[in-house]
C-alpha cells in the first residue's frame, strides 16, 4: 500500500506547511507528499534555493471548481482550501488511500503504523473529540484523517459532502461533512494519533501533536522552535 500524505493551505500557511511536512519526513518513510496550494511551485523565499525534498509535489488549486466562490463557506474564517479534503477522491483519482494532515500538526514519531492501518471497510480513521452541541452523535476531528479513496469513489458519498459544504454553513468546514456522511463508518483511533489538548484526551507520548484552535499561539512558537532546532531536516 502506497503511503501518501496531503497538506493543503493558502499562501499564509506555506511556512507551517513546509515545517509540518518535514517533521513527517524526519520520522516516517512515505512514497509521496502532496501540497495543495495556490501556486504552481513552492516559493523559494520559504523553502530556500534548494527547493522542497523530491518526495514532495505541489498541485495548484487556485482554479478548483468543486467549491463555488459564493458558497457559504468559501470565504469563511478558514480558507476554501479547508474544504478540499471532501474532494480528495477526485483530486487523487490514481490513489487508493491518503493521509490528510493539517498544517498545524507536528509528527513526533514514526507513523508508518497509521499509514498501513486496516480501515476495516470504514471510510476513514479519525480521533474522536467531545460532541459539539449541534451533532447528536459521535464527533471526530479531521486534522488527521486516513481516507479510503476507493470506498468514497465506489459509493459516491463524497459528492454529497461537496454539496453539503456548498449549500450550508459548516463551522468546522470539511470536518462537519465527514462527521455527517461517514457517521457509523469512521474507525476510532487513539488520541496519540492526533493530540490536541482542548479537543482530545491528553496523551503524554503522542505520535502527532496538533496545535489546533486555542493552541495556535503556542503552536506558532513550537513551529518556530522546530524550525530552528539543530535536528530539523535539511536538504
Pin down the residues of each PLM region:
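Short, acidic, metal-binding catalytic loop of nucleotide-sugar glycosyltransferases
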Residues: 23-31
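Residues at the starts of beta-strands that form the adenosine-phosphate
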Residues: 32-33, 97
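Short, polar loop motifs at secondary-structure junctions
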Residues: 37-42, 111, 130-131, 193-195
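Short internal beta-strands
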Residues: 33-38, 126
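Active-site-proximal specificity loops/subdomain of glycosyltransferases
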Residues: 43-90
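Short Gly/Pro-enriched turn/cap motifs at secondary-structure boundaries
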Residues: 77-78, 134-137, 167-170
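A glycosyltransferase accessory/donor-loop signature
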Residues: 1-9, 16-19, 142, 147-235
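GT-A fold catalytic core of metal-dependent nucleotide-sugar glycosyltransferases
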Residues: 81-139, 146-147
